[in-house]
Amino acid sequence: MAVPFRRTSKTVKRKRRTHFKLSVPGMVECPSCGEAKLAHRVCKACGTYKGKEVISK
């Protein structure tokens, strides 16, 4: 089995990991109730999507 020829330095390791970051979710305001919700998803507070009630509460 292959073994690394040299030890990976802290700098090289950290530079490689700069791209392994989490992205912020796209939060928007619900047009019917004003709660914060994820874009392109049903609002958890009022149950509407694209102006129509999808989930009755």
UniProtKB/Swiss-Prot annotation:
Gene Ontology MF annotations: structural constituent of ribosome
Coiled coil: none
GO aspect biological process, one term: translation
Keyword Ribosomal protein: yes
Pfam families membership: Ribosomal_L32p
Alphabetized UniProt keyword annotations: Ribonucleoprotein, Ribosomal protein
A GO cellular component annotation in the UniProt record: large ribosomal subunit
Residues spanning the signal sequence: none
Membership in a protein family: Belongs to the bacterial ribosomal protein bL32 family.
Family annotation (HAMAP family): Ribosomal_bL32
Protein name (database record): Large ribosomal subunit protein bL32
